[in-house]
């Protein structure tokens, strides 16, 4: 990189314009060097060196070098000699005595010039005494001063500061260590104590650069080590750990450098908006989002390695240095292990290398003994070494297979062993397939965890089904799970359900075969292996059916029951499905989904018990609903004749698709109407099927569905289900299942306003124009190709249309308006949002009441794609 050294700038070059030009040349040279794969360490160090020269030249220009007893000092990251393109340049103007006013004015001009150059300068002007006083009270200041580096000015003044900072009285090593540990805990808590965040902060997230800094700060305070290399020389790190930390730091630096050259303002968050460009800069390429997912996989794996090293090394430091090697007395477990306090440790230094299967033994002891919380630091170091020296996966060792199955069958392994096995890399060392999903992310808003993290959370959710206290949240699973004969089959299905992701092809099919082979290899019977592999293959079946199919259609229930075949499979599947949803995204599970899955579960259970050769008698169900609804209405004072006259206007489908309580509720208000010409809008005061039911009764009008959903969308409510029905005499009986933005039923306090506005737009009779709103920030960075598919159905009267599109505001309203404009009748809708994707099902008929023709389907597809494309403002 050829550029002029700032020390050689003449006075004419020290104008804002000239200096900006020189800084731009330097920045562009660094950017080009980075894109040409120049080592990032050289670039980070050379940027700090360039700033050293520039600040030194300006210091001299302002005449500060002629003044005794003041120094210009780099602190913080700049003090370490590390600067990324947008890093803060933290400087300290240090003096022995308080500066006179005229000198402070001149220093202010110096700092203002740096700001005019658009440099992110953080500065302080302090005496040595002030630094000492503030540093003793403020951990951040103390840490920055520890990394102080003289740029120019008085060496003596700087050495006075160093004497203060290095003295034991400034921050005793143990006090500093405890404070930094607490600081790290608080920082990790801000990121939910996980390395897996969708838009991670490269610097501050657990496993990020700050975790490496914390190690260096602690070692510097205790040993005086000024680099990772010196830390290894003091024995704080082994050579292998030193190389690993350097490798991790190098990757994180490359990610941060790539991010900074894309930004105009300082930020360390790897947002969706910038993941694409960063991946490209780092050479990660692939079809679609493959490049991003590959880059983020490497990123998350690096965070895991740093987090593991950070935790282990700090504990070793605490045990060996702070506590002087004193430990609690050992309690012998067997010839291989002992317990010391709440930690398990190996009794032999090379146990895991000599007999790798004992790694699994250790976790069996953890599962057995509730007094053991984790692994001792020396044993963790031994485990890390053994893990890296394994020449084959653990599952290839017969003894290890036996112990793994012992763990899978152990009643305490779910909540005591598996999460720790994953965290310490043992699952990846056991299963080659698991090692492939570690850090595997999906570039979307639906999956908030990497595949491995999601799978472990799924196992943890399964464990919650064992406790009666969770019955209200998971009534079916808490009833079903305890009676499963072989819970280990469910756990194996959970481990394998997503194991095929990231390898191309259908992950369910990949996992199905690998799960079967694994089960046979581990001594399970063929029927057991078939059940596990079936669960893996169909782990999405129940969720998709409940949320995206009309589960009140007997045909849908029959088809689902045929795939499930028996109640045993149904019970395993419902537990896997619920745990899968809960482990995908903490915001996904709500009373609406619970109700849908419960209705599908019990409907299928009844179908299986009745026998699939004995379908539901539709007429009997209608009669049953009418009898119960009529009894409720008569209690309210209505005569049988009034009820009969009203029901003669309704079609049979109405009585089939509503419960008797819904029918009675609707009809009571219809019969009490003073003016049948006015619209009627009802909202259920109690949550119905997990949401708020909005019922609309009015004369049919053009684009009524679009009008209602547009009004609800305007109020930030989400329609999840709609049943669109008409009476024989031209009235609509439409039911919308609505949730608020948090997936809950609408607050009763809002009902009056919602009803008022809906009645107003319905009485107006004119279709509500779909108002476009700005696409939410997070959605702006995702592309979802609009797809319109027409699904096969046995019905000769109706068409099933599936729409996949970006979940843009107004999507449902514009879809409904398109149906109306083309003269198609909408009979039902199932609305599903999967992160940034809308996956909606609509039941349609033509203007004549029959199925859409192929030509009509083609026209509808083209029109919808066109109208949705114009939605975005």
Swiss-Prot record:
Activity modulation notes: Uridylyltransferase (UTase) activity is inhibited by glutamine, while glutamine activates uridylyl-removing (UR) activity.
UniProt keyword Disulfide bond, yes or no: no
The enzyme's E.C. designation: 2.7.7.59, 3.1.4.-
Domain of life the protein comes from: Bacteria
Gene3D superfamilies per record: Beta Polymerase, domain 2 (3.30.460.10), cca-adding enzyme, domain 2 (1.10.3090.10)
Region of interest (Uridylyl-removing), ranges: 333-692
Cofactor: Mg(2+)
UniProt catalytic activity: [protein-PII]-L-tyrosine + UTP = [protein-PII]-uridylyl-L-tyrosine + diphosphate; [protein-PII]-uridylyl-L-tyrosine + H2O = [protein-PII]-L-tyrosine + UMP + H(+)
Protein function: Modifies, by uridylylation and deuridylylation, the PII regulatory proteins (GlnB and homologs), in response to the nitrogen status of the cell that GlnD senses through the glutamine level. Under low glutamine levels, catalyzes the conversion of the PII proteins and UTP to PII-UMP and PPi, while under higher glutamine levels, GlnD hydrolyzes PII-UMP to PII and UMP (deuridylylation). Thus, controls uridylylation state and activity of the PII proteins, and plays an important role in the regulation of nitrogen assimilation and metabolism.
Family membership noted in the UniProt record: Belongs to the GlnD family.
Protein name as it appears in the record: Bifunctional uridylyltransferase/uridylyl-removing enzyme
């Amino acid at each position: 990189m050829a550029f002029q050294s700032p020390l050689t700038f003449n006075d004419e070059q020290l104008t804002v314009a000239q200096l900006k030009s020189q800084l731009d040349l330097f920045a562009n040279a660094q950017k080009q060097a980075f894109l040409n794969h120049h080592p990032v360490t050289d670039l980070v160090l050379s940027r700090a060196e360039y700033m050293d020269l520039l600040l030194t030249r300006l210091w001299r220009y302002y005449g500060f070098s002629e003044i005794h007893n003041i120094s210009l000092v780099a602190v913080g990251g700049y003090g370490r000699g590390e600067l990324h393109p947008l890093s803060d340049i933290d400087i300290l103007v240090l003096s022995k005595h308080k500066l006179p006013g005229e000198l402070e004015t001149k220093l202010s001009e110096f700092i203002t010039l740096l700001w005019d150059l658009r440099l992110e300068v953080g500065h302080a002007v302090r005496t040595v005494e002030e630094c000492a006083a503030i540093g003793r009270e403020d951990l951040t200041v103390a840490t920055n001063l520890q990394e102080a580096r003289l740029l120019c000015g008085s060496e003596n003044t700087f050495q006075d500061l160093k004497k203060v900072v290095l003295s034991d009285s400034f921050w005793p090593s143990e006090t500093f260590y405890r404070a930094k540990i607490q600081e790290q805990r608080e920082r990790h808590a801000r990121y939910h104590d996980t390395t897996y965040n969708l838009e991670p902060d490269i610097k501050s997230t657990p496993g990020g650069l700050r975790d490496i800094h914390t190690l260096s700060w602690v070692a510097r305070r205790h040993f005086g080590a000024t680099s990772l290399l010196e830390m290894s020389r003091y024995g704080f790190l082994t050579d292998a750990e030193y190389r690993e930390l350097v490798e991790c730091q190098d990757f994180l630096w490359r990610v941060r450098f790539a991010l900074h050259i894309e930004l105009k303002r300082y930020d360390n968050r790897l947002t969706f908006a910038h993941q694409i460009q960063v991946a490209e800069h780092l050479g990660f390429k692939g079809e679609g989002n493959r490049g991003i997912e590959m880059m983020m996989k490497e990123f998350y794996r690096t965070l895991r390695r740093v987090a593991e090293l950070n935790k282990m090394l700090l504990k070793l430091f605490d045990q060996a240095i702070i506590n002087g090697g004193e430990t609690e007395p050992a309690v012998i477990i067997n010839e291989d292990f002992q317990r010391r306090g709440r930690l398990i440790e190996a009794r032999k230094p090379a146990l895991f290398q000599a007999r790798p299967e004992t790694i699994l033994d250790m976790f069996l002891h953890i599962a057995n003994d509730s007094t053991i919380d984790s692994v001792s630091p020396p044993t963790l170091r031994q485990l890390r070494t053994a893990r890296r020296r394994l020449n084959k996966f653990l599952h290839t060792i017969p003894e290890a297979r036996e112990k793994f199955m012992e763990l899978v069958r152990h009643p305490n392994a779910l909540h005591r062993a598996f999460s720790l096995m994953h965290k310490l890399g043992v699952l990846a060392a056991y299963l080659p397939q698991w090692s492939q999903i570690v850090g595997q992310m999906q570039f979307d808003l639906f999956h908030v965890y990497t595949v491995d993290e999601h799978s472990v959370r799924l196992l943890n959710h399964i464990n919650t089904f064992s406790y009666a206290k969770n019955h209200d949240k998971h009534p079916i699973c808490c009833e079903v799970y305890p009676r499963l004969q072989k819970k280990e089959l469910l756990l194996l299905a959970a481990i394998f359900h997503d194991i095929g992701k990231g390898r191309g092809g259908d992950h369910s099919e990949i996992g199905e075969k690998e799960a079967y082979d694994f089960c046979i290899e581990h001594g399970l019977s063929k029927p057991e292996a078939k059940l596990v592999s079936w669960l893996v293959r169909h782990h999405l079946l129940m969720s998709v059916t409940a949320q995206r199919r009309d589960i009140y259609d007997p045909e849908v229930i029959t088809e689902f029951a045929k795939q499930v075949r028996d109640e045993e499979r149904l019970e395993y599947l419902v537990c896997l499905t619920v745990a899968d949803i809960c482990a995908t995204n903490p915001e996904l599970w709500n009373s609406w989904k619970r109700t849908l899955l419960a209705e599908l579960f019990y409907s299928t259970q009844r179908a299986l018990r009745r026998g699939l050769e004995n379908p539901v008698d539709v007429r009997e169900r209608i009669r049953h609903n009418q009898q119960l609804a009529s009894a409720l209405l008569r209690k309210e004072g209505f005569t049988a004749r009034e009820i009969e006259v009203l029901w003669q206007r309704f079609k049979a489908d109405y009585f089939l698709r509503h419960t008797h309580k819904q029918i009675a509720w609707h009809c009571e208000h219809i019969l009490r109407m003073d003016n049948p010409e006015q619209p009627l809008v009802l909202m259920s005061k109690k949550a119905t099927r997990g949401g708020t039911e909005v019922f609309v009764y009015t004369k049919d009008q053009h684009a009524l569905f679009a009008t209602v959903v547009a009004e609800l969308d305007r109020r930030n409510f989400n329609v999840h289900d709609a049943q669109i029905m008409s009476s024989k005499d031209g009235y609509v009986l439409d039911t919308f299942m609505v949730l608020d933005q948090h997936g809950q039923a609408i607050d009763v306090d809002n009902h009056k306003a919602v009803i008022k506005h809906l009645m107003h737009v319905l009485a107006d009779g004119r279709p509500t124009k779909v108002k476009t709103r700005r696409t939410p920030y997070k959605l702006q960075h995702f592309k979802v190709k609009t797809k319109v598919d027409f699904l096969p159905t046995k019905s000769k009267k109706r068409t099933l249309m599936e729409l996949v599109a970006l979940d843009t505001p107004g999507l449902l309203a514009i879809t409904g308006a398109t149906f109306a404009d083309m003269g198609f009748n909408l009979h039902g809708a199932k609305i599903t949002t999967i992160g940034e994707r809308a996956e909606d099902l609509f039941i349609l008929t033509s203007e004549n009441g029959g199925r859409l023709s192929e030509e009509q389907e083609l026209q509808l597809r083209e029109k919808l794609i066109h109208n949705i494309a114009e939605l975005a403002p």
